[in-house]
């Protein structure tokens, strides 16, 4: 079995936040959130990281992030560009929005041939998540089904005081396997608990605190990249017709299709750790405070890459 690889999705545009939050420092040493994730992954056993970025940020990204990690881990860069489409497909004129997380991952198909974990660059998952991913990926292989894993977080640990968020709300069976994910695009804190709305805030449905949600923290066997490739044209046929400027090939949607087709299982491992992220600029202070506190507790050294 090959050594698992960490894939970090860092090509997104950060539309709600403004600016390149993938590289935005969250401590006095200049580390970004993704430095902490890569550090946690390295401690868990990962030896190689692949960053999915855009050509436009390559120089800055290599200079600010890559350079300090390269002495400690094998680093590769993959580029998610709009025009990376199958033969016969074209980007609609005027479209600037990337084609989503499934497309980002598909861009890795020529450099990754091992089990892999996938994370968002701008989410903080905590050391335990990476240990669970590494342990799973080094002990599980596909049999007659694809065998995947997802690290879920309790919704109460993933919402911000500063606005609404989008979360994949998970239904899990009694054996801890994923039944379905429902993307709720507007969840916010209302009083003591989280709630979602489907009608622009006219009515709200509460979500219990311990409900597991997906934060794009997955573990896949190598064959998943082929699945993404095989399913992409059908997505484009539909998406480019219905929403040419906005359609996105979402990673969880592809997983959901495989579950419906009974071709895969996804074991859900719940992390009780708090998730941190900067969806809104106002979130940054709480992330910085949390990082500072974890350093004081000895979870992280002052400088990660010394």
What are these regions (language model features)?
Residues 2-66, 73-75, 80, 114:
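N-terminal glycine-rich phosphate-binding loop and ensuing alpha1 helix
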Residues 69-114:
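Short phosphate-binding loop-to-helix
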Residues 87-98, 163-168, 282-286:
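Short, surface-exposed amphipathic charged segments that create phosphate/polyanion-binding patches used
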Residues 114-124:
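Short beta-strand-to-loop acidic/aromatic patch adjacent to the donor-nucleotide binding site
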Residues 127-215, 222:
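Conserved core of the sugar-phosphate nucleotidyltransferase
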Residues 221, 280:
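Short, conserved phosphate/pyrophosphate- and ester-handling motifs at nucleotide-, phospho-/glycolipid
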Residues 229-264:
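A C-terminal functional module that forms or caps the active site or interfaces directly
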Residues 283-306:
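Generic C-terminus detector
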């Amino acid at each position: 079995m090959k050594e698992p690889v960490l894939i970090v999705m860092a090509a997104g545009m950060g539309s709600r936040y403004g600016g390149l939050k993938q590289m935005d420092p969250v401590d006095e040493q200049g580390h970004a959130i993704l430095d902490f994730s890569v550090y946690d992954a390295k401690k868990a056993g990962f030896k190689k990281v692949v960053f999915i970025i855009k050509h436009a940020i390559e120089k800055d990204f290599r200079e600010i992030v890559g350079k300090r990690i390269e002495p400690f881990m094998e680093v590769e860069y993959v580029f998610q560009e709009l025009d990376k489409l199958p033969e016969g497909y074209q980007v609609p004129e005027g479209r600037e929005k990337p084609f989503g997380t499934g497309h980002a991952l598909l861009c890795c198909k020529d450099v990754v041939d091992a089990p892999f974990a996938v994370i968002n660059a701008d989410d903080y998952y905590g050391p335990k998540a990476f240990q669970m991913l590494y342990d799973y990926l080094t002990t599980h292989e596909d049999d007659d089904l694809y065998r995947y894993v997802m690290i879920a977080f309790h919704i109460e640990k993933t919402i911000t005081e500063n606005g609404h968020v989008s979360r994949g709300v998970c239904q899990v069976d009694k054996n801890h396997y994923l039944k379905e994910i429902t993307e709720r695009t507007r969840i916010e804190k209302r009083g003591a608990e989280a709630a979602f709305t489907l009608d622009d805030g006219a009515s709200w449905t509460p979500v219990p605190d311990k409900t597991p949600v997906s934060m794009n923290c997955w573990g896949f066997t190598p064959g998943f990249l082929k699945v993404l490739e095989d399913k992409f044209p059908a997505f484009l046929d539909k998406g480019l017709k219905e929403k040419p400027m906005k359609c996105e090939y979402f990673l969880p949607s592809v997983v959901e299709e495989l579950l419906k087709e009974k071709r895969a299982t996804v074991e859900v491992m719940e992390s009780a750790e708090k998730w941190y992220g900067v969806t809104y600029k106002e979130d940054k202070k709480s992330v910085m405070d949390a990082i500072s506190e974890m350093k004081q507790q000895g979870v992280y050294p002052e400088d990660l890459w010394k």
